[in-house]
Amino acid sequence: MAGPLVSALIAHLDSSFEGPNGDYPAIMEAIAGLTAQQALWRPSPERNSIWQIVDHLAASKEWQIEMLEKGQAESPPWTEPPGDEESWQALVIHLKDTHKRLKLALEHLKDEELLEYPVPELNRTLLELILSSGSAHEAHHGGQLSYLRGLREGKFQV
């Protein structure tokens, strides 16, 4: 069973991923009901689409899992989406799956491990790394997703 610090961290990650949290849009709330065509939209050619941000979030969760399990991970690449509905739905399922797998990886940690420095040259505890690459990162992108959706639909969601 996870200790209180690990449990609080998982609850925080769940809040930024699934909501509701009242402070900022959760990832799954921001993409609920979107089609592939809607997810592909971008406000200008040089900006990322909702699809690309969702793909980036799934890849970032994979990175976090690798860091927890192996102590190192490659930076996730940005990719161009295939664009079809089946691929979009598969990506949403993959995102949910990586969230579950990240939670499982975290549940195996002891609270004390969160206070260790896994990458000494970064001079940050595992807890700091997870908060910055996990929930803070998701809150940032949750805002982007909600904003992009609002731009596309001609309204803003809060």
Predicted regions and their residues:
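Short, contiguous alpha-helical
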Residues: G3-V6, I10-I31, A36-E80, V119-V158
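Acidic/histidine-rich alpha-helical segments that form the ligand environment
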Residues: G83-Y117, E128-H137
